[in-house]
Regions:
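Conserved N-lobe loop of protein kinases adjacent to the ATP-binding glycine-rich P-loop
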Residues: 33-41
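AlphaC helix of the eukaryotic protein kinase fold
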Residues: 54-73
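Activation-segment/catalytic-loop signature of the eukaryotic protein kinase fold
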Residues: 85
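Protein kinase glycine-rich loop
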Residues: 17-25, 29
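Conserved short submotifs of the Hanks-type protein kinase catalytic core
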Residues: 89-103, 107, 111
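Catalytic-loop of the protein kinase fold
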Residues: 138-155
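Activation segment signature within eukaryotic-like protein kinase domains
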Residues: 126-127
Length: 328
């Protein structure tokens, strides 16, 4: 594997690397500043090939250009704008706008510390906002393939979710490694977030994105990882053991999480219609199970504390009486 480019390096006589934001098996993402645009920040993704022979590099270049052309078509406020691709030092780079904010994974971790998980109202808003951007890319014939809390940023300026890290680089890697195989050697999508047909068969469709979005939603609601929310023996979801939501909303999520693709919603429009008829007032009155348990625990602690104080007072009074008797 190629070593990371040194921080401070200027690529294309223009993009100065500031820091490494993250790295996966096939991609390294860095923050850079565009010296040609008043040092504007941008996200620089570097494709990390597992093989470096001439045929692999040539195939990577071809696929990279093809996928870049797809990304170039995307013009949506909830997706970082694609800027350019280039090759330097025998490395392939993809440049996009930098989005300032926190991923929903980081936000969830922060909330877990204070035990204040996402409410039904919050995830309903999140879900509706995400459906809007998914409808846009699906209409372009583009599937994200890798939806998860790590790949959605809540933009700092307006608190709107922004979809990042399309499975493009990993998709390139699978095609480069196994171009002639019906089933690629490497699947695109995270285990337990992507549905079985995507992981096992490499088949990604609109409703596989919906499946991953539903998994992300229940993770935000429960604070649990997907593998903790699945009955491994029956291969069914048991997320409702951890959180209370309105029956209508639970029905929608469960349909999105159906094991068989044919049992799921087949389009974003179907999900939007189902969400549109949910009783909003009732959903706003619901608390998550964790919140209810916290309230119950606090009440119990207060009751125990009060009873303990009464007992201590009685003991003190009893001791004083005994002391008085002994003095006489």
């Amino acid at each position: 594997m190629q070593v990371p480019i040194t921080i401070g390096t200027i690529l294309q006589n223009r993009y100065r690397l500031i820091s490494i934001l993250g790295q996966g098996g096939f991609c390294r993402t860095s923050m850079a500043e565009d010296t040609g645009r008043f040092n504007e920040l941008c996200a620089l993704k570097e494709f990390i090939p597992q093989q470096t022979n001439a045929n692999t590099v040539a195939k990577s270049q071809e696929l990279f250009s093809r996928e870049a052309a797809i990304l170039y078509k995307i013009q949506h406020p909830q997706i970082p704008k694609f800027r350019a691709t280039f090759e330097e030092h025998q490395r392939l780079f993809l440049l996009q706008d930098y989005v300032k904010g926190k991923t929903y994974r980081i936000i969830l971790q922060e909330r877990q510390v204070t035990n204040s998980l996402f409410s039904e109202v919050e995830v309903l808003t999140f879900l509706r906002q995400m459906l809007s951007v998914l409808a846009y890319i699906h209409n372009l014939g583009i599937i994200h393939r890798d939806i998860s809390p790590e790949n959605i940023i809540r933009r700092e300026t307006d608190k709107i979710p922004v979809l990042i890290d399309f499975g493009v680089v990993k998709e390139i890697a699978t095609k480069v490694q196994s171009p002639d195989l019906a089933k690629p050697l490497t699947s695109v999508g995270k285990f337990c977030y992507a549905p079985w047909e995507q992981i096992q068969l490499g088949r990604a469709t609109a409703n596989s994105d919906l499946y991953a979005l539903a998994v992300t939603t229940v993770v935000l609601l429960t604070g649990k990882e997907p593998q903790e929310l699945i009955n491994q023996a029956k291969l069914t979801w048991n997320w409702q053991q951890w959180v209370v939501v309105s029956p209508g909303f639970a029905e929608i999520i469960n349909k999105m999480l159906s094991r068989q693709p044919s049992d799921r919603y087949q389009s974003l429009t179907e999900v939007e219609k189902a969400l549109a008829i949910l009783p909003r007032v009732k959903s706003q009155q619901l608390l998550t199970t964790n919140q209810q348990l916290n309230n119950f625990s606090a009440s119990q602690e207060a009751t125990v504390g009060a009873n303990l104080n009464k007992i201590l007072a009685l003991i003190m009074a009893f001791l004083m009486i005994i002391s008085g008797v002994q003095l006489h």
